[in-house]
């Protein structure tokens, strides 16, 4: 299937218009989980060392985090959903039973993100984040099965807004 055919197949604005408010609520619910985890676990984490590392290695700081955040929220979330749900998951679900596809893509999605946080936290926290991301990916797979990529994109973008909000709190 060509990219154009894949885009046409997975992006249904007609369907999205009917359910966008449900996706907004789901996104807010998942974002609340991220925020709750931050407020609960945040007391046990030295965020100053993380911000120092991010500033040194990636040149991300309070001055440019909004621009980087806008990229992550709008474009990166779209690219990730198209790749992980619209391509990888869509191809795998045809060839493997559902639970195998969910497990593999959930784990792969979380490991794809581990490069960003493995050096910031202790092993138990890295494991918890990785399992949480795998669970999130499975939720997104199930959402993709029932809806289309616009819905996945909106939910992902809302979760990313929460993450950028956390980053702003950490940097200030």
Regions found by a protein language model. Give the residues of each.
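Functionally important transmembrane alpha-helices
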Residues: 123-172
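Structural signal for membrane-spanning alpha-helices in multi-pass inner-membrane proteins
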Residues: 1-3, 34, 38, 42, ...
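Membrane-interface helix/loop boundary segments of multi-pass membrane proteins
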Residues: 79-104, 144-149
């Amino acid at each position: 299937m060509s990219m154009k055919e894949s885009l046409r197949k997975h992006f249904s604005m007609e369907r999205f218009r009917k359910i966008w408010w449900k996706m907004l609520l789901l996104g807010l619910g998942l974002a609340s989980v991220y925020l709750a985890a931050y407020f609960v676990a945040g007391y046990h984490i030295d965020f100053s060392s993380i911000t120092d590392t991010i500033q040194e290695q990636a040149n991300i700081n309070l001055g440019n985090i909004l621009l980087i955040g806008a990229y992550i929220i709008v474009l990166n979330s779209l690219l990730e959903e198209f790749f992980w749900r619209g391509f990888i998951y869509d191809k795998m679900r045809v060839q493997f039973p559902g639970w195998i596809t969910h497990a593999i893509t959930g784990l792969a999605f979380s490991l794809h993100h581990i490069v960003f946080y493995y050096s910031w936290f202790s092993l138990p926290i890295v494991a918890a984040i990785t399992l949480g991301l795998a669970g999130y990916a499975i939720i997104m797979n199930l959402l993709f099965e029932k809806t289309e990529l616009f819905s996945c994109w909106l939910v992902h973008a809302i979760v990313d807004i929460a993450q950028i909000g956390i980053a702003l709190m950490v940097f200030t």
